């Protein structure tokens, strides 16, 4: 439900941070790519001044994975579906397919291809079973999906569903962040929650 005008503002905000990479934890598409195509949204994503990487979310699947993949390509976004890529010196980004795909690769299989000496960032849209990343020695997991409930008091309900429905968490040596995202779903509003982008600084 973000308009092109809204997205343009978010792109400007993020570009002002001078990022080395932009990570998107899925759900760019919501049921159909047609509104995005009509609004010319791909052009806004191409304005990012850094490489953009993403994984698929459940709503991307609802729109049809081939349709969503088409939009990601047109938007210049590197889509990671159960694959890993180097995004900087000593950093590996692992993108999991959404759990909507019941045949996605187990994380332990994916991690066999990752150099254990690299700092590893995992993109996984839905923040279920966070212990999986910890067991595989992932350094940082970034997820979305929950919108932090979007409307109070749904955020309370989500806190009962997920180990972490919003914000930061540390389990062992693995750090997590579940973002409320910049977008909204259903009603075009939030109550008691905020849209956000997250700046991750590695030192």
Can you annotate each of these PLM segments?
Residues 1-203:
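Soluble catalytic domains of enzymes that build or remodel membrane lipids, polysaccharides, and related
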């Amino acid at each position: 439900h973000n308009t092109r005008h809204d997205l343009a503002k978010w792109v400007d905000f993020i570009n002002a941070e001078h990022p080395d990479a932009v990570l998107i934890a899925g759900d760019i598409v919501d049921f159909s790519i047609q509104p995005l195509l009509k609004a010319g949204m791909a052009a806004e994503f191409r304005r990012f001044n850094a490489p953009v990487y993403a994984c698929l979310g459940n709503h991307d699947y609802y729109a049809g994975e081939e349709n969503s993949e088409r939009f990601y390509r047109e938007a210049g976004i590197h889509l990671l579906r159960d694959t890993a890529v180097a995004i900087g010196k000593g950093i590996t980004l692992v993108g999991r397919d959404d759990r909507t795909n019941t045949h996605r690769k187990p994380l332990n299989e994916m991690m066999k291809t990752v150099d254990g000496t690299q700092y590893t960032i995992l993109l996984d849209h839905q923040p279920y079973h966070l212990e999986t990343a910890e067991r595989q020695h992932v350094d940082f997991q970034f997820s979305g999906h929950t919108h932090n409930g979007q409307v109070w008091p749904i955020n309370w309900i989500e806190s009962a569903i997920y180990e972490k429905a919003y914000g930061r968490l540390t389990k062992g040596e693995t750090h997590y962040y579940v973002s409320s995202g910049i977008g909204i779903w259903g009603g075009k509003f939030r109550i008691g929650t905020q849209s956000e982008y997250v700046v991750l600084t590695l030192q």
